[in-house]
């Protein structure tokens, strides 16, 4: 039949594309990388002509592998503060795309949230200033909250007082569980957690969300995709193909927001890959916990670096991020080519058109 012929022709064309292999960080069980998991499991990487080898490596080990000529890793897709600290140490890193945005929460004990809220300013600044705070060091939700307070008239001196550990105004904890327990035991009044932990631990530790950090700064960047400038130059076509496949997987994920059968398929694929329970995966992907975004978002990176630097996260980094132009370490060309080509090849696709518009706005 004609359809079969078309399909055969399409398959032949697909087979003709071979842009080689990319070694990509897929940390075991980590579903923050759901878009990559989908692109792999649905065969989109292959269709676009790139072989993606999954490497169970994350954090500084991954950045070191990317930075070294003989390291067997091309791309890290989770985290961002560590990327900036590595750039400060002289690593040859460049951001080429995004994994997710937002994702932090301000929490308190059940029944206490209202006293920290304000209808006009989201947070009641006086209540926040007099509260005892708990968090894990480098927690993005605090970085964003801190910047929000500064942007709304809270002075540097007041922030310094809040962050003075010797006064007991702030306490740092080893992990997210310890932060949640500190709220439950009334060791702290307000705490900062990734949103998934705030929701996961709500019942077990009597927590409620005061505000999402994304309410304070919409679309603030978190997990970015980084490679090295050398690897990007060497494997540019493979990176473009990789980004095309990811954008297609992102579209499929978004369809799950309105189509139950797609949602179920997405959840099953990610649950099967990760070994996590389907209910947990469903909440994580579609329950308002995670906001995915494939765009590199240069504007958001610049804004986040300012906030992170103001909070002291980057002081030991080796360069002064107040004067350093982080755009030197952002290369949007692979993603830009991918979304431009997809939008051109699919002129009736409103999703691609909106991503292209977003790309043009956020990456001046």
Spans of features found by a protein language model:
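Conserved C-terminal helix/tail region of periplasmic/extracytoplasmic solute-binding proteins
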Residues: 306-364
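Short linear loop/turn motifs
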Residues: 53, 60-61, 161-168, 282-292, ...
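Solvent-exposed, polar/charged alpha-helical surfaces in well-ordered, non-transmembrane soluble domains
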Residues: 34-37, 42-43, 64, 84, ...
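Secondary-structure end/capping motifs
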Residues: 234-320
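Short, glycine-/small- and polar/acidic-enriched structural segments
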Residues: 11-175, 189-195, 209-213, 218-219, ...
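Gram-positive cell-envelope targeting signals
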Residues: 1-14, 145, 242
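Sec/Tat-exported extracytoplasmic proteins
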Residues: 43, 48-49, 70, 77-80, ...
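Pocket-lining segment of extracytoplasmic ligand-binding domains
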Residues: 172-272
């Amino acid at each position: 039949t004609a359809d079969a012929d078309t399909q055969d022709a399409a398959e032949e064309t697909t087979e003709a594309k071979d842009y080689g292999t990319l070694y990509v960080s897929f940390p075991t069980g980590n579903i923050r990388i759901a878009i990559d998991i989908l692109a792999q499991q649905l065969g989109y990487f292959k269709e676009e002509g790139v072989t993606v080898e999954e490497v169970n490596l994350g954090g500084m080990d991954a950045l070191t592998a990317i930075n070294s000529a003989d390291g067997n890793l091309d791309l890290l897709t989770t985290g961002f503060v560590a990327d900036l600290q590595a750039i400060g140490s002289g690593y040859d890193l460049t951001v080429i795309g995004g994994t997710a945005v937002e994702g932090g929460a301000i929490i308190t004990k059940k029944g206490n949230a209202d006293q920290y809220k304000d209808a006009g300013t989201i947070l009641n600044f006086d209540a926040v200033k007099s509260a005892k705070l708990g968090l894990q060091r480098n927690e993005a939700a605090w970085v964003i909250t801190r910047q929000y307070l500064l942007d709304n008239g809270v002075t540097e001196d007041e922030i310094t007082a809040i962050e003075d550990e010797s006064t007991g105004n702030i306490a740092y904890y080893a992990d997210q569980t310890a932060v949640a327990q500190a709220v439950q035991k009334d060791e702290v009044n307000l705490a900062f957690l990734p949103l998934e932990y705030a929701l996961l631990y709500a019942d077990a530790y009597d927590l409620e969300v005061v505000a999402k950090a994304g309410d304070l700064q919409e679309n603030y960047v978190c997990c970015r995709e980084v490679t090295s400038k050398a690897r990007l130059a060497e494997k540019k076509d493979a990176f473009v193909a990789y980004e095309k496949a990811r954008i297609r997987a992102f579209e499929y994920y978004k369809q799950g927001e309105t189509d139950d059968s797609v949602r179920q398929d997405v959840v099953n694929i990610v649950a099967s890959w990760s070994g996590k329970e389907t209910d947990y995966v469903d909440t994580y992907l579609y329950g308002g916990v995670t906001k995915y975004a494939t765009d590199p978002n240069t504007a958001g990176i610049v804004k986040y670096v300012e906030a992170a630097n103001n909070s002291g996260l980057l002081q030991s980094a080796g360069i002064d991020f107040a004067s350093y132009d982080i755009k030197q370490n952002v290369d949007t060309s692979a993603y830009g080519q991918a979304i431009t080509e997809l939008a051109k090849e699919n002129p009736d696709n409103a999703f691609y058109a909106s991503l292209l518009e977003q790309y043009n706005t956020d990456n001046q």
